[in-house]
Amino acid sequence: VVFDDVYIEGITKISAKDIRYAKEMGSAIKLLGVARNTDTGIEAYVCPMLIPNDHPLATVNDSYNAVFVHGDAVEDAMFFGRGAGELPTASAVVGDIFDIVRNIKANCCGRIGCTCYKELPVKKMEDTYNRYFLRLHVEDRCGVLAEMTEVFAKYHVSGAQILQRDSQRQDDHLEEVV
C-alpha cells in the first residue's frame, strides 16, 4: 500500500457533543487505523470511527493503544498496551537503536521484508461501508422525519437509531441525530 493512497482524517472535527451522542447510542468514538483485504480491493484508512461499547476497542483509553486482528485461524485477537508516555517512548527508541546496531553489524539496511507481496488496488474511502452518525439541524414541523427517511431510502442509507432531544431546540429547529 502506498502511503498517499491511505485516507487520513484526524479528530479535530469531533466535538464534545459528538462524544455525548455516541455515548447515548451505546458507542464510543475512537481514532482507528484500518487495513482490510476485501474482494474488491484493500481498505486502508485512519479516521474517527463509531465503535459499539461491547467491542474490545471501545475500552482502550488514555495512553493505551491496541491492535485488533480478525483472521481465519485466530478469529478475534487484541494486543493491548501503553503507546505513549515516558517508558513506552523510551522502549521504542531503544528498540530502534538495537535495529540500527544490527543493521550496522550485518552491513545491511533493514530486515528482509515479506517476499509474498502482491499489488492490490486501494479502495477510496467513499467506496467503503462503515457506521456513521449524522447530526442534522431540521425544522420543527410535522413530516420532517418522513422527509429525512425518504432521502435516506433514495440513497440506500440505513439508520439504526434516531435521537431527538427537546433540549437541543434552537429557534424553530431541532437537532436530529441519525
State each model region's role:
Residues E75-A77, G81-L87:
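Glycine-rich phosphate/pyrophosphate-binding beta-alpha loops
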Residues K30-L31, Y45, F68, M78-F80, ...:
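Structured core elements
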Residues V1-T59, Y64-A66:
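Substrate-binding/catalytic subdomain of NAD(P)-dependent oxidoreductase enzymes
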Residues P56, E75, P121:
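Glycine-rich, flexible loop/turn motifs
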Residues V34-R36, H70-D72, H137:
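A generic structural motif
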Residues A92, I97-V178:
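A conserved regulatory-domain signal marking ACT and ACT-like small-molecule sensing domains
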Residues K13-K17, Y64, A84, P88-G95, ...:
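Conserved active-site and cofactor/substrate-binding residues in soluble primary-metabolism enzymes
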Residues V1-V2, H70-A77, D127-Y129:
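Short acidic (Asp/Glu) and glycine-rich catalytic loops that position anionic groups and cofactors
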